[in-house]
């Protein structure tokens, strides 16, 4: 072996060691960021702790009979399971284990999705490591104790199966997401596009209500009424009278005194905008490549909460996740996840740190520019495909 060959081998080993060190550091930081679960927010003490104590002391059957919890049965079963750890760990930690566990599983599926794009190499590991350390991800789960990671996990799994051309499993995963949180509807425009592109047969959409109804059966057997479990989402939609719950979207600029007309106009604007985007995308005859699929999935979960009224500060969480995947599939969009982190992070600070609502408006401006750019990018890609075909 020559001296030059020896140098090349040593250089390669050094690069590999540095890469392994970098990956280990990312995962270690992600783990450390989730060790402190002591923060107790108003939502945690007002709702979660009340439900936790009631289920622990009276049982989940009584909780269902009295309609205590304001979430779906699927979520309620998971939440009730945390009381089994009552003698082992503090209730705040037990509750936060749900989204933290979802973070870990999501990390694996982010790896799997990026591995589809890169069958060889370390980029999938980097994608997983970066995801695990994204600020809005670990803050949402380990510190805030919210459950956005749970329904988003099944959106990620759904996207994975669609990329693998297994639509039945993709729709099943989505149905589970919808059975947990209504915010799963942000993914529906993407599913409609797949249907119009003949990637999903119509009958598979029946899985959504079927899985939801099946998930309700144990709750009904425990004493809940069918009317209660089937109208949970209707009740949630009318709970708050505001156009924007500090969401960095269009409605943060509209005074809440215009709630009535603003809600009606907002719903019309949202429907027309999403319908126009779906039709425009469906009419494109170019191949639906995996790169395009992840881009369309991101636009779906970012455009939908952007144009819908009554959104909350955390509702761009799926966009925070999918934007990272998009950056690995389309490296020239590397800045997109950074900007989504910034806009979502600014919105988080109002609730968690008591900062000015003006920061949400800055986040809304960032999202306006970002979503407009993504739509323009989609258009440019479609035009390029048409030119190549001709």
Named regions from a protein language model:
Residues 22-27, 199-220, 339:
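Hydrophobic alpha-helical membrane-interfacial segments at the cytosolic entry of transmembrane helices
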Residues 18-19, 107, 116, 236-307:
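Aromatic/glycine/proline-enriched transmembrane-helix motif characteristic
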Residues 1-33, 115-116, 124-126, 289, ...:
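Start-transfer (signal-anchor) and selected internal transmembrane alpha helices
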Residues 2-4, 37, 229-249, 279, ...:
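Transmembrane helical bundles and short interhelical boundary loops of multi-pass, membrane-embedded
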Residues 38-53, 66-78, 241-250:
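Extracytoplasmic catalytic/substrate-binding loops of multi-pass membrane glycan-assembly enzymes
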Residues 73, 88-108, 259-269:
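Loop-to-helix entry region of an early transmembrane alpha helix in multi-pass inner-membrane enzymes
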Residues 26, 30, 111, 124-160, ...:
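Membrane-embedded helix bundles of polyisoprenyl
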Residues 1-5, 186-210, 221:
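Perimembrane helix-loop-helix junctions
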């Amino acid at each position: 072996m020559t001296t030059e060959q020896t140098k090349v081998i040593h250089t390669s080993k050094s690069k590999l060691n540095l890469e392994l060190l970098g990956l280990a550091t990312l995962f270690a930081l992600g783990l450390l960021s989730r060790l402190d679960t002591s923060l107790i927010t108003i939502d945690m003490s007002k709702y979660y702790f009340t439900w936790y104590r009631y289920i622990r002391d009276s049982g989940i059957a009584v909780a269902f009979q009295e309609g205590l919890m304001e979430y779906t049965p699927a979520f309620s079963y998971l939440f009730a399971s945390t009381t089994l750890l009552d003698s082992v760990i503090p209730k705040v930690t037990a509750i936060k284990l749900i989204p933290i566990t979802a973070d870990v599983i999501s990390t694996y599926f982010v790896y799997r999705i990026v591995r589809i794009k890169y069958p060889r190499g370390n980029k999938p590991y980097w994608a997983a490591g970066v995801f695990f350390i994204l600020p809005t991800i670990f803050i949402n789960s380990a510190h805030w104790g919210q459950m956005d990671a749970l329904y988003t996990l099944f959106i990620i799994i759904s996207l994975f199966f669609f990329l693998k051309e297994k639509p039945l499993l993709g729709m099943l995963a989505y149905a589970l997401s919808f059975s947990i949180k209504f915010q799963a509807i942000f993914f529906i425009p993407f599913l409609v596009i797949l249907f119009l592109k003949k990637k999903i047969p119509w009958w598979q959409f029946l899985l959504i209500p079927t899985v939801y109804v099946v998930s309700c059966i144990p709750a009904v057997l425990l004493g809940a009424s069918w009317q209660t479990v089937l109208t949970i989402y209707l009740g949630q939609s009318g709970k708050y009278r505001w156009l924007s719950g500090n969401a960095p979207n269009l409605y943060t600029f509209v005074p809440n005194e215009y709630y009535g007309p603003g809600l009606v106009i907002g719903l019309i604007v949202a429907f027309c905008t999403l319908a126009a985007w779906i039709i425009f995308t469906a009419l494109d005859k170019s191949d639906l490549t995996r790169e395009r699929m992840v881009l369309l999935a991101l636009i779906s979960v970012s455009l939908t909460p952007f144009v819908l009224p009554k959104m909350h500060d955390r509702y761009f969480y799926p966009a925070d996740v999918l934007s990272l995947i998009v950056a690995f599939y389309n490296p020239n969009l590397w800045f997109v996840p950074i900007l989504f982190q910034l806009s979502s992070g600014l919105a988080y600070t109002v609730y968690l740190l008591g900062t000015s609502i003006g920061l949400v408006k800055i986040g809304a401006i960032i999202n306006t520019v970002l979503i407009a750019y993504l739509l323009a990018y989609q258009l440019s890609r479609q035009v390029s495909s048409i030119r190549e075909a001709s």
